[in-house]
């Protein structure tokens, strides 16, 4: 088990589940060699769950959790609208931090978590959109 959490999914609010799954994803990616930069970056356009570095590449991570794979599971829950919001938010982040979107290496990854919230199955999609 990557992360020990005794929280029951039944008594966990949506906000708490988001924090739990984002922590899990952050730890998972750190173990894969990525370096943590920031969590829950907000702009008027939306939110970026995690910002990590993979070498010199900025990795903007969307974390999704679903208890079951019904209705397509966690990956299918990322709509075209959500993707556009994330892309606009990335542009804002880069400009706010003095980075040029045209010559700053970056990508968008998805970490999809499914099943028991205390030991979810992890799917990591690099360059997801």
Swiss-Prot record:
GO molecular function: nucleic acid binding
Superkingdom: Bacteria
UniProt xrefs under SUPFAM superfamilies: Restriction endonuclease-like (SSF52980)
Family: Belongs to the UPF0102 family.
PANTHER family: UPF0102 PROTEIN YRAN (PTHR34039:SF1)
Name of the molecule in the record: UPF0102 protein CPS_4433
Organism field: Colwellia psychrerythraea (strain 34H / ATCC BAA-681)
Taxonomic lineage: Bacteria, Pseudomonadati, Pseudomonadota, Gammaproteobacteria, Alteromonadales
């Amino acid at each position: 088990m990557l992360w020990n959490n005794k929280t029951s999914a039944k008594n966990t609010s949506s906000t708490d589940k988001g924090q739990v799954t984002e922590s899990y994803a952050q730890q998972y990616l750190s173990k894969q060699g990525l370096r943590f930069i920031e969590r829950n970056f907000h702009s008027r356009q939306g939110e970026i769950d995690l910002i990590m570095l993979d070498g010199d590449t900025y990795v903007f991570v969307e974390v999704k959790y679903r208890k079951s794979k019904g209705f397509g599971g966690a990956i299918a829950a990322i709509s075209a609208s959500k993707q556009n919001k994330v892309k606009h938010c990335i542009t804002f982040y880069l400009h706010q931090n003095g980075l040029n979107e045209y010559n700053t290496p970056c990508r968008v990854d998805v970490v999809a978590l499914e099943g028991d919230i205390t030991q979810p199955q992890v799917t990591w999609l690099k360059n997801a959109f």
